[in-house]
């Protein structure tokens, strides 16, 4: 059975995530991670046109034997011919990366499907698949309502969404399992909440210190279960049914080795209880920059 892990490449091309480990990786580190991932049986990369110079870096390193999932960014203002823009964007990315066919092309901004260019965007995606530029088409979502809106328009082959031990919104009422039963591939991302959950609780970034009750509960629960933050996050997603791929961001081969090791462990026995729903400002990274003090 093929490895479920997918290497996220955002930090290959730009600063990404939280903390000291959020810096853009060096070319040498990037190369080492890819070589090590290949030895572990990981065969898929997740990238995006908006990830800085990631496409060029991947092309320079050479990833001909990898499956590559990419994402089309939000349609810029002033674009009149969406089909031409999509084709040009994907063609340029494929040329930079050095692939003849993508494993999948996802829409990064689900709202584009219901915008003024929605029909043209969908036609462009289907045309790319028809012309064998990609094997599959899909969408990257943030919350349940994104997908519910899209399902009124078409059924994507892949849905990528955030899921982690504190953000379980898409797990309510076995929603992901329901999606999987529809024949849609489910890919999850942000299993460490972009690195935030791996922080030493004594060194939380200032903009997150206002969630002190959460950090106290998180620290106490980890201690009671004798778990590290990384182990807890990984073993939590091990318990979720209906997941096809798990996108992880790593900053070194040692980091990847640690994560891979915990994926061989059984699911955690007892999940943390927060007492009430966690604030959206904590679990939704789109809101982080809006709430800096």
Language-model-detected regions and their locations in the chain:
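Active-site mouth loops of central-metabolism enzymes
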Residues: 14-28, 72-84, 114
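Beta/alpha (TIM)-barrel catalytic core signal, keyed to glycine-rich beta->alpha loops juxtaposed to Asp/Glu
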Residues: 110-291
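Acidic (Asp/Glu)-rich catalytic clusters
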Residues: 58-67, 94-100, 150-154, 177-181
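Alpha-helix-loop-beta-strand connector modules within alpha/beta enzyme cores
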Residues: 56-71, 123-131
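Acidic-and-aromatic substrate-binding clefts and catalytic sites of carbohydrate-active enzymes
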Residues: 46-56, 75-83, 112-116, 165-171
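Active-site groove signature of glycoside hydrolases
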Residues: 94-113
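Short, acidic/polar
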Residues: 22-36, 81-97, 142-149, 233
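N-terminal binding-site loop/beta-alpha segment at the start of enzyme catalytic domains
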Residues: 1-67
């Amino acid at each position: 059975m093929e490895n479920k892990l997918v290497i996220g490449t955002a930090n290959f091309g730009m600063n990404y995530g939280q903390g000291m480990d959020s810096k853009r990786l060096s070319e040498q580190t990037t190369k080492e991670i890819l070589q090590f991932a290949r030895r572990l049986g990981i065969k898929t990369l997740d990238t995006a046109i908006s990830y800085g110079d990631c496409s060029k870096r991947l092309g320079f390193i050479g990833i001909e034997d990898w499956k590559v999932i990419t994402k089309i960014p939000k349609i810029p203002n002033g674009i009149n011919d969406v089909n031409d823009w999509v084709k040009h964007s994907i063609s340029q990315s494929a040329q930079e990366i050095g692939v003849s066919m993508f494993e999948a092309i996802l829409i990064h901004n689900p709202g584009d499907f219901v915008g003024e260019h929605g029909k043209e965007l969908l036609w462009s995606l289907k045309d790319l698949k028809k012309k064998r530029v990609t094997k599959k088409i899909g969408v990257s979502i943030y919350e349940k309502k994104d997908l519910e809106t899209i399902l009124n328009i078409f059924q994507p082959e892949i849905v990528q969404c955030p899921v982690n031990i504190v953000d379980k919104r898409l797990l309510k009422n076995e929603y992901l399992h329901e999606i999987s039963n529809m024949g849609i591939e489910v890919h999850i991302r942000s299993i460490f909440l972009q690195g935030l959950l791996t922080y030493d609780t004594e060194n939380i970034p200032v903009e997150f210190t206002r969630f002190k009750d959460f950090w106290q509960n998180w620290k106490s629960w980890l201690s009671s279960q004798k778990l590290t933050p990384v182990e807890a996050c990984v073993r939590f997603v091990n318990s979720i049914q209906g997941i096809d791929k798990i996108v992880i961001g790593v900053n070194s081969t040692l980091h990847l080795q640690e994560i891979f090791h915990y994926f061989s462990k059984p699911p955690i026995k007892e999940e943390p209880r927060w007492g009430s729903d966690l604030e959206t400002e904590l679990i939704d990274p789109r809101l982080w920059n809006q709430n800096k003090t």
